[in-house]
Structures are given as C-alpha cells and as structure tokens.
C-alpha cells in the first residue's frame, strides 16, 4: 500500500480527538466514565488497523461513528456484515479461529490471494498487520481489536460447533 494513503479507510487517534471531542464527552457521560477511560475503551474496541508496517493505528470509522451517535459501545461493523465469506474460507482451508494470531504472509505475496487465504481475511478487515520482520520480509497478522475478537468468538464459534 502507498504510505500516503494508510489512513484513507479510517481515522487516526489524532483525527478522532480533534474532530469528535464533544461526542467523546457525551459518550463518557452516558456511560459514567471519564474522558480518558472513554478514549481507552474506543481504542481497545475500534483501533488497531495497520495497513503497512510501523504505522499508527487506524480506527474503524463505522463503529466509532455509531458508538458516538448512540452513546453506547457495540460491535457495529461486525453486526453489519455477513460472515459467510469468513466462515467459508476457514472451513475450506480447515483453519481454526486460534490460528488468526499466528497468521503470516510474506511481503512478496501481499497481492496474491490464491497463495495465502489469510490475505483475503486481512483484506476484509478481520486481520491486521501486527508486526513486520525485515530480515525475512514477513508480516505477522492478528486480530485488530476487541470488536473483531469478540465478534469472531461470539458469532463464528457456534457455527463451527454445529458442523
């Protein structure tokens, strides 16, 4: 990805704080939290997307805006999507949900979804870049935040138990 566009699909914490101070304070008041605690909760639930190594985290704007508008935390992005795509990939390749924290992709394969199904999962927003090994040119992927982690566990786990 071109470094100039790493935050095009979301917002940085700096942008969040600069543009949504009033909404953050209203959310804090509605939930009986301090502003600092509210920012920490927003970060844990909706931040964590990285589209390139060693970059600032990107917040999911859909979930942040819904949280601020409704003054309550929820899995807005996860609930707004159908997850059959993810379920089908995991089933087809016999992946376990726990493998998400061990997913790796070679840098030269970042544009080749046929080679590694985890790339498709990453491109769909369920995984993000956690680290990069310069020596081996290898990306370590992982679940970006609590919204995705809880969504995967709450929605997909029962599907796997049924099959």
Regions found by a protein language model. Name each.
Residues 1-163:
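Phosphate-binding site recognition
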């Amino acid at each position: 990805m071109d470094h100039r566009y790493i935050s095009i699909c979301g917002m940085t914490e700096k942008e969040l704080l600069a543009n949504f101070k009033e909404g953050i304070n209203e959310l804090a008041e509605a939930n009986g939290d301090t502003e600092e605690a509210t920012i920490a909760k927003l970060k844990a639930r909706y931040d964590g997307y990285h589209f390139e190594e060693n970059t600032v985290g990107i917040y999911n704007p859909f979930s942040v805006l819904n949280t601020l508008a409704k003054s309550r935390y929820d899995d807005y992005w996860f609930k707004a999507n159908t997850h059959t795509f993810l379920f089908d990939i995991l089933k087809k390749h016999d992946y376990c949900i726990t493998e998400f924290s061990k997913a790796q992709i070679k840098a030269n394969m970042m544009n080749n979804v046929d080679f590694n199904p985890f790339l498709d999962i990453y491109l769909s927003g369920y995984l993000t870049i956690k680290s990069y090994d310069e020596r081996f040119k290898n990306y370590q992927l992982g679940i970006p935040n609590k919204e995705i982690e809880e969504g995967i566990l709450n929605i997909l786990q029962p599907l796997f138990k049924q099959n």
